[in-house]
Amino acid sequence: MTNIAILGTASDVGKSIVATALCRIFSNAGVDVAPYKAQNMSNNSGVTPDGFEMGRAQIVQAQAARVAPHADMNPVLLKPNTDTGAQVVLQGKVCADKSAREYFGDTQRWAEAAFESLDRLMVRHELLVIEGAGSCAEMNLYQRDFVNFKTARRAGAAVILVADIDRGGVFAQVVGTLAVIPPEDRALVKGVIINRFRGDKSLFEGGVKMLESMTGVPVLGVIPYFRGFTIDAEDAVPLSSVVDPKQEPSGDKIGVAAIYFPHISNFTDLAPLERDPSVELHYLHRPKSLDGYKALILPGSKNVRGDLAWLETMGWRDEIEKFRKRGGIIVGLCGGYQMLGASIADPYGVEGAPGASAGLAMLPVETVLEREKALCNSVGKIAGTPFFVSGYEIHMGRTALEPGASPLLEVTERNGVATDDFDGAKSADGQVTGTYFHGFFDRPEVRTWFLRLLDGGYESPRGASVADPFELLAKHFSENLDLEKLFAIAGLSVKGEKES
């Protein structure tokens, strides 16, 4: 079999979605397939079953491929924590903090680790679906770019180039990319996928023929815009999200606000709320009156003290305090939980210069950032309720409750081992809560419990589709791709779908 590398003409052309779809398509055909991305830049990460950290996109792709996520699938993860720097997670563990100049000044170390992981995956699996990063034709960076064509060459992969027709200029995207890359890399490109087409596909049939004539590369498919599936975004709040709206939430919706920190992380925690038809979620960067909202969420942050200082400078503290006095519900997730406490100390300079900051003092807790990162898949029960939360913890902070403080969760399991512990905190009046659990809102019963705190008349959606979203995605792509050509590129014949 021949590995497949999904490379893009630019950032955000849909490489992650395409790779996810192909993982499920090949898995349905009975192939032992796994995802791989040499380097991710993202503050959206998760924890593998064996307790290592990797990007959320590759975790989702592993689920599509029906294999357990492994740190080798995303060996280099860059988690931006300043405007010019990032924490480097190497093969699932924190390695160092590097400025962009330091990191890109010598990529050999990172490339060696990435290829070591790639080699292991090629032994373990029949086929890899490799995702590139950004544009595969950034010529000023080409020699030190180990994520795109260098990875494809190492894996002996056939390259499929993805272009986004929705942003316009698709001919320039494809023809331009193929024109500027070296001939030896151009020879690896075996197909093109035109992504995010809107309207009548038949109107672009002439365009397909023109592209094939101009490049000599077959167009494997034109993929209509698909709204039935969302993969966790890597490095920015999705464009479909509502940010700093002028209007208040609709009167018939439950208004939820989330502060959009400069270094926001794991905002995918909010996706289940955003998808609920009864909820209107707004990301707020600029301070405004919160009178139209029932809840305020402080999400995760990759630079907690920096974002706390930003929050103070912007004037958010006054609005948050007024919201609490009005009876609003406030939830802090990971970094947001730390901000709600009395203080945050960073004695080792984990997230910047060593020092300490006063928190918002809405929860009776104090946090110290340690050198060692906690990485856990965890299960806990919301104290005083029958509801269990399954989530994951990724944090450098160790948070201590003051005497008499009440935890939010009774933790029963971490990384598959039974435990008797606690997590998070809640204020005496119950208005303010915080937790380290990412994925807190994932379970429908927990979401229902939370939303009924905001609106006693809330009813969870009825009659919603229970179809596997990966199957919906695979079906959508299968109907719009030339599977015979795709499978031939991978060295396979088209097989019947695997029964689920």
Curated annotation (Swiss-Prot):
Keywords, ordered alphabetically = Cobalamin biosynthesis, Glutamine amidotransferase
Spell out the catalytic residues: C334 (nucleophile), H438
Q: What does this protein do?
A: Catalyzes amidations at positions B, D, E, and G on adenosylcobyrinic A,C-diamide. NH(2) groups are provided by glutamine, and one molecule of ATP is hydrogenolyzed for each amidation.
Quote the pathway field.
Cofactor biosynthesis; adenosylcobalamin biosynthesis
* Gene3D superfamilies the record matches: 3.40.50.880, P-loop containing nucleotide triphosphate hydrolases (3.40.50.300)
Name of the protein in its database record: Cobyric acid synthase
Q: Please tell me the species this chain comes from.
A: Chlorobaculum tepidum (strain ATCC 49652 / DSM 12025 / NBRC 103806 / TLS)
Which Pfam families does the entry link to? CbiA, GATase_3
- Report any one BP term from Gene Ontology: cobalamin biosynthetic process
> Which NCBIfam families would you find in this protein's record?
cobQ, PRK00784.1
Boundaries of every GATase cobBQ-type domain copy: 253-446
| GO terms for MF | ABC-type vitamin B12 transporter activity; catalytic activity
Q: Which family does it belong to?
A: Belongs to the CobB/CobQ family. CobQ subfamily.
